[in-house]
């Protein structure tokens, strides 16, 4: 399980050190793809295979299913940790998430997320005000 928030930097070659606490859970190879809310999702290969199976089962006749799977899979790339624990983030993914120098890496249960520091801070500020309301709405999900 992934949890926590870590501040990291991206170098001029698009490389970022993956937090040490996340490396074992991700494994030497994992998948990075476009996420929601203008961040990137990172999945261990075992989790990626489960998601892939679920998405392959979506009906091709549904426009939203086609659009989502296209967007999600076309942005996906396999990442491999180097000896320093770094990954090279593909340029299209850097552009999508507006990642430049400062990056926030968070753990969200079965995945990690990479956020632009500026976008993450704005997101947190917006969510703090409505967190109690969101929690109340989640009661129906047996949490």
Curated annotation (Swiss-Prot):
Gene3D superfamilies: Transcriptional regulator MraZ domain (3.40.1550.20). CDD domains: MraZ_C, MraZ_N. Residues 5-47, 76-119 form the SpoVT-AbrB domain. This is Transcriptional regulator MraZ. Belongs to the MraZ family. Keywords: Cytoplasm, DNA-binding, Repeat, Transcription, Transcription regulation. Transmembrane segments: none annotated. It comes from Bacillus licheniformis (strain ATCC 14580 / DSM 13 / JCM 2505 / CCUG 7422 / NBRC 12200 / NCIMB 9375 / NCTC 10341 / NRRL NRS-1264 / Gibson 46). Forms oligomers. The lineage of its organism: Bacteria, Bacillati, Bacillota, Bacilli, Bacillales. One of its GO terms (molecular function) is DNA-binding transcription factor activity.
